[in-house]
Amino acid sequence: MKNKIKIRLKSFDHRSLDQATKEIVSAVKRTFANINGPIPLPKKIERFTVNRSPHVHKKSREQFEIRKHKRLLVIGDPNPAVVDALSKVDLAAGVDVVIELESGE
């Protein structure tokens, strides 16, 4: 029976995301666990177009975009020390973390 922990990190800022992945990888490597990653996932770009003027000049528009960067870390066959190390890691405020436990039978 093989267990895996999948950690998905999402952020608007790629620098804070890379810093968070480095902190998690170093914390897991201190416990001598097997880790794969960080695997960069495709970034999602959302574009919005709005009128510059509320009344006339319909052709005058402005475009904005939001870039969502994502990374994936996979920890193979974790032990309780890994879970303890992950709970002690302090990450930046702009990084969203989703942790999934996957058990293979």
Swiss-Prot record:
An example Gene Ontology molecular-function term: structural constituent of ribosome
Gene Ontology process terms (BP): translation
PANTHER family per the UniProt record, alphabetical: 30S RIBOSOMAL PROTEIN S10 FAMILY MEMBER
InterPro entries in the record: Ribosomal_uS10, Ribosomal_uS10_dom, Ribosomal_uS10_dom_sf
Record-linked Pfam families: Ribosomal_S10
Keywords annotated in UniProt: Ribonucleoprotein, Ribosomal protein
Domain of life: Bacteria
Subunit structure: Part of the 30S ribosomal subunit.
Family to which this protein belongs: Belongs to the universal ribosomal protein uS10 family.
Gene: rpsJ
GO cellular component, one term: ribonucleoprotein complex
Name the record gives this protein: Small ribosomal subunit protein uS10
Presence of keyword Ribosomal protein: yes
Function (record text): Involved in the binding of tRNA to the ribosomes.
